Amino acid sequence: MELVNIFLETDAGRVKFVIKNTDDVCASELINKFVELLSEYIHIDQSEFYLVVKDKDIFYFKCDKGSISIVSNEFYVFDEPLLFVKDYTNVTGVEFIVTETMPCRIIPKNNHAVISVVTNHKFYNGLSL
């Protein structure tokens, strides 16, 4: 399971948030784990953002000052071809891919940067536009 709209920015490039071997783990535990990982870089209790999780399907969650709820799928596909690295030394920030209906308010920790990128790619009748 991976986040498709939130990434770490590092000295070597962009890094995915991925949790492996998730077959026997419930989704709420995994979402809490992603939020726990993010809490190292942002103030969860002061921030509002969306987590888009991809396993076999895409699921949307909203984290509002630490309170997590599932929200309706808006058919954004998050399919931009992005480059990722596996090896890095230093995390410099967190990147959020947002849409017109997914506003965010992020309070960073320890001088980490917050980067936001906007997408509008939606799934329409079998096509990614």
UniProtKB/Swiss-Prot annotation:
Any single Gene Ontology cellular-component annotation: virion component
Superkingdom, natural source: Viruses
InterPro entries on file: Virion_core
Cell compartment(s), UniProt: Virion
Keywords: Virion
Upregulating conditions: Expressed in the intermediate phase of the viral replicative cycle.
Family: Belongs to the orthopoxvirus OPG073 family.
Full protein name: Core protein OPG073
Lineage of the species this protein comes from: Viruses, Varidnaviria, Bamfordvirae, Nucleocytoviricota, Pokkesviricetes
